[in-house]
Amino acid sequence: MLFAFCCGAIVANIYYAQPIIELIAPDIGLTPALASLIVSLTQIGYALGLFFLVPLGDLLENRKLMIITNLVAIASLLGAAFAEQPNVFLLVSLLIGFSSVSVQILIPLAAHLAPAESRGRVVGSIMGGLLLGILLARPVSSLVADHFGWRAMFMAAAAVMVFISAVLMLTIPKRQPDHSASYGQLLGSLGTLLRKQPLLRQRAFYQGCMFATFSLFW
């Protein structure tokens, strides 16, 4: 349950801005035509994090990597909360998405730590927390922004990330992956897997379509 909460709270950072863009844009001097860049850059940052940051989970000590990533998220959320210029807000939006991929390091780590007989249940619970975080982020953001202003939402999110970082530091044991490949080789292996595994391509296509459909709705 603890890991499920952490994953849900971390991934929610990607979606907090979406329902309150109409409040953010005029306050930071962003034109309506460019306001959608907030959402786009956050998602682009997440995609970049998946490609460039998550593979480091096979090279670096996992707990340390997650804490550093969370610290970047905290700084980015605070940057969003205090941003006065559109360029600054767009930059930290990219970083918020980039640093939110720590959930994709936490999930396999939790699977590694769980007993074999309960591994599926543990991963399922964590994924449930992740999806719940996505679903609740928008109404929570709207509620907080309506009562306290949109900047308060990012301050609150930063505070939650501080709490999560402390919890992870205290509860997760260190794990140094036993992997001999270099970072470049790991990045290259992503293309190799996609090329040699037709089932992976099929599942990736399905998931991409599902995410696109969900994004259109939510």
Predicted segments with their positions:
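Juxtamembrane intracellular "pre-TM" segments in multi-pass secondary transporters
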Residues: 173-204
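Conserved MFS/SLC helix-loop-helix module at the cytosolic interface between two early adjacent transmembrane helices
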Residues: 48-86
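Residue-level signature of mid-helix packing/kink "hotspots" within the transmembrane helices
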Residues: 15, 43-51, 101, 134-135
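Helix-loop-helix hairpin linking two adjacent transmembrane segments in secondary transporters
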Residues: 124-172
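Extracytoplasmic
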Residues: 2-32, 103, 217-218
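Pair of pore-lining "gating" transmembrane helices in MFS-fold secondary transporters
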Residues: 1-16, 196-213
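Cytoplasmic helix-loop-helix junction between adjacent transmembrane helices
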Residues: 92-129
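Short hydrophobic/alpha-helical segments at membrane-entry points of transmembrane helices
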Residues: 87-93, 202-203
